[in-house]
């Protein structure tokens, strides 16, 4: 896998702020070799940042299934040429609309299955531990780890008016570490 070009993606999938990190390469995993795609309902984030981060507005929807389908269609359009994708698993401590989250994710998994795209599920605690060293890391800790690793302060760049790290910054960071974890796992398995 070290010298072979591959296209992989890490998906932080949700109803309110889905984000996909696409990496194409055969060597070291770097931020510059990634492209990020996210959906937002905030117009000022629906644009490109730094040349490799691309935000789009959510599509209009009237019923839940229409919403799930539009998000999954958006994702599959980006993921069609991937050799492998990794999806963050469910947070079993989650509260609220957990069945909506499961239905939404189920639509994506089904569409990826139809496309023949292999999916690996990574538990949220593994993503957090891989990114920050702590399996219970919060958004601030993940952002701090990302800045330390990449030298890029996405919060200051994209959401300078927000007090805390939130969407879309936290979604981009999570998708980055989901993709990087899969890249690392693929390299290890090829040894």
Task: Kindly give the residue locations of the regions a language model identified.
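Phosphate- and other anionic-substrate recognition elements at nucleic-acid/protein interfaces
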Residues: 1-191
């Amino acid at each position: 896998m070290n010298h072979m070009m591959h296209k992989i993606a890490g998906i932080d999938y949700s109803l309110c702020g889905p984000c996909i990190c696409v990496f194409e390469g055969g060597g070291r995993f770097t931020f510059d070799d990634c492209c990020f795609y996210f959906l937002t309902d905030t117009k000022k984030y629906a644009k490109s940042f730094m040349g490799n981060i691309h935000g789009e507005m959510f599509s209009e929807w009237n019923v839940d299934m229409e919403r799930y389908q539009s998000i999954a269609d958006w994702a599959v359009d980006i993921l069609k040429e991937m050799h492998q994708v990794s999806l963050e698993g469910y947070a079993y401590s989650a509260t609220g609309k957990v069945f909506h989250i499961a239905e939404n994710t189920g639509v994506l998994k089904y569409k990826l299955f139809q496309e023949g795209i292999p999916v690996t599920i990574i538990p949220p605690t593994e993503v957090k531990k891989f990114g920050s060293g702590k399996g219970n890391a919060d958004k601030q800790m993940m952002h701090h780890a990302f800045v330390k690793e990449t030298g890029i302060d996405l919060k200051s760049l994209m959401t300078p008016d927000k007090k805390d790290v939130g969407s879309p910054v936290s979604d981009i960071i999570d998708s980055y570490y989901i993709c990087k974890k899969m890249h690392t796992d693929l390299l290890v398995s090829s040894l």
